[in-house]
């Protein structure tokens, strides 16, 4: 029931992303190269990745505790005026991945996407700091937003797998991490959110049956 949900306090851990949209008018092809020529009209910056998940959750639950990383001022600006989101910054020194999408302003079509870097690399100190903060807060439930940007590896991944708490997984495949960010690295989850391609990559199958997926459904969970 919605009234019950509105009283919930949830915990989210994941990688932040800046979704940058540059709207352009397509004016033709350049004269010296076979390249599309566009005229920039406006730019929008939106909090993506785990920031988007936190903003959506904050609109209908009592409190969101967000475990993420990056420049504090940038995170605050991207989250907007949401007083019920408490940020636990795991590594303030880490850059936030930015994905720029060039959009045909007349048709709304995406022309090309550019990403500023492929993944983050965390120092031993960053990892230990992240582990300490997660243990200290002892979350009763944990939504994991894994976009393959480097947070969920090695010791932190092992800790999450061993946490005695309900875990809800969103493990994303994209063009940069294709084939390298699979849900099979996780154990003991209560909920799993994947699309068809992500299932096929993880199970190494071109076609899927209900039986293929059934074995990965938790006894008291959902996919």
Name every feature range the model reports, one short phrase each.
Residues 1-223:
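Ribokinase/PfkB-type carbohydrate-kinase core domain
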């Amino acid at each position: 029931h919605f009234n019950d949900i509105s009283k919930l306090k949830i915990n989210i851990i994941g990688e932040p992303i800046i979704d940058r949209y540059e709207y352009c008018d397509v004016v033709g092809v350049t004269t010296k190269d076979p390249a599309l020529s566009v005229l920039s009209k406006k730019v929008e910056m939106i909090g993506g990745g785990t920031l988007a998940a936190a903003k959506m959750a904050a609109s209908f639950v009592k409190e969101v505790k967000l475990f993420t990383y990056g420049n504090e001022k940038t995170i605050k600006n991207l989250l907007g005026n949401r007083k019920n989101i408490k940020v636990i910054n795991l590594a303030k020194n880490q850059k936030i991945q930015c994905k720029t999408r060039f959009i045909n302003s007349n048709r709304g079509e995406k022309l090309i996407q550019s990403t500023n870097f492929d993944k983050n690399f965390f120092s031993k100190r960053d990892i230990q700091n992240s582990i300490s903060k997660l243990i200290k807060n002892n979350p009763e439930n944990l939504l994991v937003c894994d976009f393959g940007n480097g947070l969920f590896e090695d010791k932190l991944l092992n800790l999450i797998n061993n946490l005695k708490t309900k875990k809800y997984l969103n493990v994303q495949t994209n063009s940069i991490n294709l084939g390298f960010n699979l849900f099979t690295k996780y154990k003991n989850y209560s909920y799993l959110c994947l699309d068809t391609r992500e299932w096929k990559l993880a199970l190494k199958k071109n076609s899927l049956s209900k039986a293929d997926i059934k074995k990965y459904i938790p006894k008291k969970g959902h996919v």
